[in-house]
């Protein structure tokens, strides 16, 4: 029996989907434990790019069972479109995908609430993806939400109507101009609900417990990144769920002492989408080059990601919070061609150098302290072994390992699953 955990250590978009895809053959079960369709996991193989939003990244492997856990929020409409997008691969979705009855549903009015709330904030917007994630988690913690298991109840539509009416009153309270046709949105929603009913719903915590007793190997898949965690991220510019290791326990019903390996995924540089502090952000041609070469555009929103140098203060913090046992560095190939690379090793925080991640990292409080490294010119995308990597990249990797005190086991040198070097 093995229960391992894979999660992102930055502000999301680290490349988790690719690594899950690479590792899936080692596991019987891939289980998503938090987030919703605001996250996009990008996989690329055979020259074709695939973006998954809610479905776990093991769906393309014939022998794996994929679980959507109780910590996930599901938009039935988006979910149906995601399944339709997989039909061309002739996958047995009903056999390969099962859903926790305790996962919460995103209603059309959740999305409208999200838009109304964001519009009302003016310049103080937090950069919401407007997918209804925040309002759904608010209903969950406020004990008002609807769950997947409620679909099976005879009075589901009455429960829906009661909650949707509350939402409409809240939307009116915001007093912003949002145009919508709720009747049309609800028609689409209930059609998607009927499709959702065709899948198997489970009591996921019992399923996971029995799987562990049977000796099954399980990989828990996180969405977004640790610095977006509602408790440990750069609040309020965060998501509404726990993206850290603790979220796997509450989002799947797995006991903490059952988790063995914690795989931490990070980019060789840093990106962020939307608003929020970003100490190492670059506003020059270097940052623009990173975005262009790295194709740094959100897989869900399409928004260009902000780019910056690797931040070891933030990375060390994420490693500590998650108890990471192995690191995996993504997009090493994007840094090819830069004369000089920089790594933030400390923050100058209110005039004093510190090496820990403080409560407030707004620009007026934090200035990054950098160590410079010599860059490399070599194209990495065709390399297959660690020994083939340029010496400058090896020095970069070894410095990170020394500072973080966790080994880097995988270096990604391209988007395809084959462009993955094991160290």
UniProtKB/Swiss-Prot annotation:
Residues that hold Mg(2+) according to the record: 13, 40
Cellular component GO terms, alphabetical: cytoplasm
Domain of life: Bacteria
One GO-annotated biological process of the protein: 'de novo' AMP biosynthetic process
Subcellular localization(s) per the UniProt record: Cytoplasm
Example of a GO MF term: adenylosuccinate synthase activity
Catalytic activity as recorded in UniProt: IMP + L-aspartate + GTP = N(6)-(1,2-dicarboxyethyl)-AMP + GDP + phosphate + 2 H(+)
Residues noted as binding IMP in the record, renumbered to the chain: 13-16, 38-41, 129, 143, 224, 239, 303
InterPro entries given in the database record: Adenylosuccin_syn_GTP-bd, Adenylosuccin_syn_Lys_AS, Adenylosuccinate_synth_dom1, Adenylosuccinate_synth_dom2, Adenylosuccinate_synth_dom3, Adenylosuccinate_synthetase, P-loop_NTPase
Active-site residues per Swiss-Prot or TrEMBL entry: 13, 41
Cytoplasm listed as a keyword: yes
PANTHER family, A to Z: ADENYLOSUCCINATE SYNTHETASE
Role of this protein: Plays an important role in the de novo pathway of purine nucleotide biosynthesis. Catalyzes the first committed step in the biosynthesis of AMP from IMP.
Subunit details: Homodimer.
Family according to the record: Belongs to the adenylosuccinate synthetase family.
UniProt name for this protein: Adenylosuccinate synthetase
Originating species: Flavobacterium johnsoniae (strain ATCC 17061 / DSM 2064 / JCM 8514 / BCRC 14874 / CCUG 350202 / NBRC 14942 / NCIMB 11054 / UW101)
